[in-house]
Amino acid sequence: MVGALCGCWFRLGGARPLIPLGPTVVQTSMSRSQVALLGLSLLLMLLLYVGLPGPPEQTSCLWGDPNVTVLAGLTPGNSPIFYREVLPLNQAHRVEVVLLHGKAFNSHTWEQLGTLQLLSQRGYRAVALDLPGFGNSAPSKEASTEAGRAALLERALRDLEVQNAVLVSPSLSGHYALPFLMRGHHQLHGFVPIAPTSTQNYTQEQFWAVKTPTLILYGELDHILARESLRQLRHLPNHSVVKLRNAGHACYLHKPQDFHLVLLAFLDHLP
């Protein structure tokens, strides 16, 4: 079944935080005349935006609560992993969201996008990791093998006391997420691959064996990696597919609001 929602096309098929990084409070004060002028300006901008093609959505505007405190730290032991974490502001959901990243990004991406803050506001604990050699995580020899990458991710989740993970895996992070999925999918409550790498390393039968609820997400303008990964990921028996319109490979950057809507809908409907 195919449908459309907010510009998206969809198909249905331990270590503890160490360093506080916030919160940030933004305050505004305007007169009535300024508010009226601002409203008129926004209306004109909206009309121009609708009528003309434009750049990707601004990613610096937080969609979640700017008062959320983002914590950070390092996991213990060998090959420590740097992480950013938010705790639920309201009544906590059972699942916890673990955010990986692509080649050009790191855990800070999810803070800049407002994803961490939004998940906290919606009652989710969320942890964003810096993969080895990225951000504040040092390179690791363990990451040179498939088994080592799976073990590294499993250890990070254990050290962070993540019990019911929903793993969000864009692009390069597929090198870590897919080996972990194949070996430890019973530990995952959900899986959100975003045009991940390494799908070609596994057979149809291996994908069929994974029963984890999966949201396959990709950008309409990603004509290479998204299509390659989709061919294999479709073999996951419990999946849905969402295509973000007018978005490229890093679709969560190009369409952050659509991405957040789709992600929250998936999380909110997990058992």
UniProtKB/Swiss-Prot annotation:
Topological category with respect to the lipid bilayer: Single-pass type II membrane protein
Main location: cytoplasm
Glycosylation sites: N67, N201
Keyword NAD: no
GO cellular component, one term: membrane
Compartments where found: Cytoplasm; Membrane
Annotated transmembrane regions: 35-55
UniProt keyword annotations, A-Z: Cytoplasm, Glycoprotein, Hydrolase, Membrane, Signal-anchor, Transmembrane, Transmembrane helix
Disulfide bridge positions per record: none
Keyword Transmembrane: yes
Gene Ontology MF annotations: hydrolase activity
Active site, per annotation: S171 (charge relay system), D222 (charge relay system), H249 (charge relay system)
EC number: 3.-.-.-
InterPro entries linked to this entry: AB_hydrolase_1, AB_hydrolase_fold
Function of the molecule: Possible role in granule neuron development.
UniProt similarity note: Belongs to the AB hydrolase superfamily. ABHD14 family.
The protein's name in its UniProt record: Protein ABHD14A
Organism from which the protein derives: Homo sapiens
Classification of source organism: Eukaryota, Metazoa, Chordata, Craniata, Vertebrata
Originating gene: ABHD14A
